[in-house]
A protein has these predicted regions:
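NAD(P)+-binding Rossmann beta1-loop-alpha1 motif at the extreme N-terminus of oxidoreductases
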Residues: 1-64, 70-72
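Short helix-capping segments at alpha-helix termini
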Residues: 37, 98-102, 121-126
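Conserved beta-strand segments of alpha/beta enzyme cores
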Residues: 41, 62, 104, 127-129
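Short beta->alpha hinge that forms the Motif I/post-I loop of the SAM-binding pocket
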Residues: 47-48, 84, 108-110
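Short, charged, surface-exposed secondary-structure boundary motifs
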Residues: 54, 114-117, 137-142
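Rossmann-like NAD(P)-binding element
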Residues: 66-104
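ADP-ribose/adenylate-binding Rossmann-like module
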Residues: 99-119
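Rossmann-fold dinucleotide-binding core
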Residues: 121-146
Length: 146
């Protein structure tokens, strides 16, 4: 277990690609906070202006222009974490296919089968690894993230 502690990981092991989080609600926002606390380059998208204002006021790199965020992900070879409700995943994947066609993708969406079916429909399996959220509450939005 000590090998997994952050203070036991070498700087070479910490050389991660930038992380792009699409969806800065409870889970996406919490991931952003944790990554930033570890000095990992992280930026993200939320569709709400209020979410962008709140996140940027706290010093986080958040935007509400999905095209710009995904273009940046592409140019920095970022890993994209999809953290949106299931009903929004198809549109997000379509945007990723258009603006970040070579980035790795994972997700923290609450269901796996539906996400994977959408991934297959877009022939994105080679760059996708499904994830699972390990936190959550009844609250939502940037303000609920910790």
């Amino acid at each position: 277990i000590d090998q997994l502690r952050p203070d036991s990981i070498s700087s070479a092991q910490r050389a991660l690609p930038p992380i792009c989080i699409v969806g800065l609600g409870l889970i996406g926002g919490s991931i952003m906070r944790d990554l930033a606390a570890e000095n990992i380059t992280v930026f993200g998208y939320t569709h709400t202006k209020a979410g962008v204002r709140a996140a940027t006021r706290e010093g986080f790199d958040a935007h509400n222009d999905l095209t710009a965020v995904l273009s940046r992900a592409s140019s920095t070879n970022a890993l994209i974490i999809i953290a949106v409700p299931m009903h929004a995943v198809a549109d997000i994947l379509d945007a990723i296919a258009m603006y970040a066609p070579n980035c790795g993708i994972t997700d923290v969406v609450s269901v796996k089968q539906g996400v994977y079916e959408l991934i297959q429909e877009r022939d994105m399996q080679i760059r996708y690894v499904g994830g699972h959220p390990m936190s959550g509450t009844e609250d939502s939005g940037w303000g609920a993230s910790k």
